[in-house]
């Protein structure tokens, strides 16, 4: 397979879409593609004159914004290696990642700038403020001079105009060249630096072009909700759309469901990329209350009326997401079965994909028209997927993936790399699943999360949690093991409890009723013996999956 230059795709998009809108900070300023090119060129001049060379590491840590995107593009198209860091990480984690990655420069957002301690990152030559690219810290005279005289140097290099023909970016030498190092939060509680090669960025962009290229056109609007420092948001809310010539809107502050819903209504995106939590919250808050009255339930069960009612409900759900999208692509964590069953029953245009940072990220996908509910699609373009099981259709086994999207390995961690990528090039995901005869993959849980029943039965806590989360007043839950008993930690929906004027005793009674109902829905060996109320929301990773390693029954 011949893999073209990824940076050539970036360069071509900038030139082809020169006078079109490119990046907008929601309710703020807009950069056109030529503005992006000009900003990239200025950063290249600063890099060159401050001593940054090809292969140097440049870290970025801040909320999504147009300037974050520009700094990332400038890094790759200069030939440096990008190190995106999630802004939600604690300061010590940021320090550790900067140091471990050998970063030379660090771009920081406004909040991160006030939290980090430069003295704990001795290898850095400078810290640059993302909102205006000013210097927060400079440890070399070259960097100080380059930033102070940047406009002057740009004017000398381009005395009249900066034109399309001046755009001349670094082209990677081969597809295996390292493009970026992406540090995962990881379910084990420590970060690993995933080395993402250019071929993986291209593989994901080419996959997106294959499945969405005819549905999305230059100038279409896209909303960036997921953090760009996470591969899911990076690949499918930024890179593909930028290459396509779309107009990307950044929600620069922590987006609540209300803000997201408002943005959907105003921007009307052409495709929506999301994690289950966002979809579930919007459905539960904006849609379920309207359809859970007795009259609506009765109409839904009358065959003649049911179809029209479902069409009307589908329109309502679609309008909650802007009403202009080809499909909603959901990934990043397990999708609640109650919400998924509802969306499927009313004909909502959604699909669920599957991926991992180590595959930058896509592994499985299927268009909504052919999507099998409960699955996460089939092996994506350029990828192979198999289940490590003697009977992949019926007995869950580890999901393995192979193809150009797979990482080079973990930075400075050969042992972890060998444990994750075998000698035949298969990436071992750590997830358990089955595959039907048509190639649809069904995730059964993470192998690390698997619990053992009293008689050695495999118990997948996610399956129990999925049912429990659909019961009364349950916002979220974690199932843990104590000896041979299973205990469910439940964070209640306190807003709903308050609406119903329920006190602590009544809430406890509801949870006991939930436990009894839950146990009628699951095998005897996985019955829950106790529900404990957990007052605070569970801590989550940036992709909104619960950090279950933090919670025990003790």
Language-model features, listed with the residues they occupy:
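Conserved AMP-binding A3 loop
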Residues: 32-34, 170, 179-205
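Conserved AMP-binding/adenylate-forming
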Residues: 2, 29-30, 45-89, 225
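Conserved ATP-binding/catalytic segment of the ANL
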Residues: 393-394, 398-453, 470
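Conserved pre-ATP/AMP-binding loop-to-beta segment of ANL
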Residues: 18-19, 147-183, 190, 215-221
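Conserved C-terminal "lid"/linker of ANL adenylate-forming enzymes
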Residues: 476, 484, 515-554
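Conserved ATP-binding loop and adjacent catalytic segment of the adenylate-forming AMP-binding
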Residues: 248-251, 328, 335-397, 405-408, ...
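Structural core segment of the AMP-binding/adenylate-forming
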Residues: 9, 50, 77-157, 484
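Conserved AMP-binding/adenylation subdomain of ANL enzymes
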Residues: 202-221, 231-315, 324, 349
């Amino acid at each position: 397979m011949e893999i073209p230059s990824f940076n050539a795709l970036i360069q071509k998009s900038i030139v082809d879409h020169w006078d079109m809108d490119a990046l907008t900070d929601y309710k703020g300023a807009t950069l056109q593609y030529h503005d992006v090119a000009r900003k990239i060129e200025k950063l290249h001049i600063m890099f060159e004159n401050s001593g940054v060379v090809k292969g140097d590491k440049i870290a970025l840590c801040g909320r999504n914004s147009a300037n974050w995107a520009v700094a990332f593009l400038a890094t790759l198209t200069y030939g440096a290696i990008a190190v995106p860091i999630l802004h939600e990480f604690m300061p010590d984690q940021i320090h550790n990642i900067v140091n471990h990655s050998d970063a030379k420069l660090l771009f920081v957002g406004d909040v991160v700038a006030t939290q980090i301690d430069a003295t704990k990152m001795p290898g850095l030559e400078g810290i640059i403020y993302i909102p205006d690219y000013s210097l927060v810290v400079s440890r070399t005279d070259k960097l100080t001079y380059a930033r102070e005289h940047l406009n002057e140097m740009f004017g000398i290099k381009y005395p009249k105009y900066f034109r399309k023909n001046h755009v001349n970016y670094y082209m990677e030498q081969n597809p295996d060249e390292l493009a970026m190092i992406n540090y995962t939060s990881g379910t084990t509680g420590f970060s690993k630096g995933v080395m993402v090669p250019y071929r993986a960025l291209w593989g994901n962009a080419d996959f997106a072009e294959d499945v969405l290229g005819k549905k999305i056109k230059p100038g279409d609007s896209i909303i960036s909700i997921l953090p760009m420092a996470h591969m899911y948001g990076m690949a499918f809310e930024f890179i593909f759309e930028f290459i396509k010539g779309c107009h990307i809107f950044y929600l620069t502050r922590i987006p609540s469901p209300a803000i997201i819903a408002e943005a959907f209504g105003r921007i009307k995106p052409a495709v929506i990329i999301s994690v289950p939590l966002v979809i579930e919250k919007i459905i539960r808050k904006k849609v379920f209350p309207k359809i859970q009255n007795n009259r609506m339930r009765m109409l839904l069960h009358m065959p003649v009326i049911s179809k029209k009612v479902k069409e009307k409900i589908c329109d309502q759900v679609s309008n909650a997401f802007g009403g202009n999208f080809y499909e909603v692509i959901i990934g990043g964590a397990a999708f609640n079965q109650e919400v998924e069953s509802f969306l499927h029953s009313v004909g909502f245009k959604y699909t669920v994909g599957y991926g991992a940072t180590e595959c930058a990220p896509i592994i499985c996908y299927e268009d909504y028209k052919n999507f099998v509910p409960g699955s996460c699609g089939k092996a994506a373009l350029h990828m192979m997927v198999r289940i490590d099981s003697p009977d992949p259709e019926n007995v869950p086994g580890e999901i393995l993936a192979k193809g150009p999207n797979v990482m080079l390995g973990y930075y400075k961690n050969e042992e972890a790399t060998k444990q994750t990528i075998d000698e035949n090039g298969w990436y071992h995901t750590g997830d358990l699943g089955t595959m039907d005869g048509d190639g649809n993959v069904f995730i059964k849980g993470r192998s690390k999360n698997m619990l053992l029943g009293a008689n050695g039965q495999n118990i997948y806590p996610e399956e129990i949690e999925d049912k429990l989360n659909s019961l009364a007043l349950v916002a979220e839950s974690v199932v843990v093991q104590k000896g041979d008993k299973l205990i469910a930690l439940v964070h209640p929906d306190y807003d709903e409890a308050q609406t119903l004027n329920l006190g602590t005793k009544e809430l406890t009674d509801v949870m006991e009723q939930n436990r009894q109902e839950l146990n009628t829905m699951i095998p005897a060996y996985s019955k829950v013996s106790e529900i404990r109320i957990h007052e605070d929301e569970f801590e989550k990773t940036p992709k909104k999956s619960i950090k279950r390693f933090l919670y025990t029954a003790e």
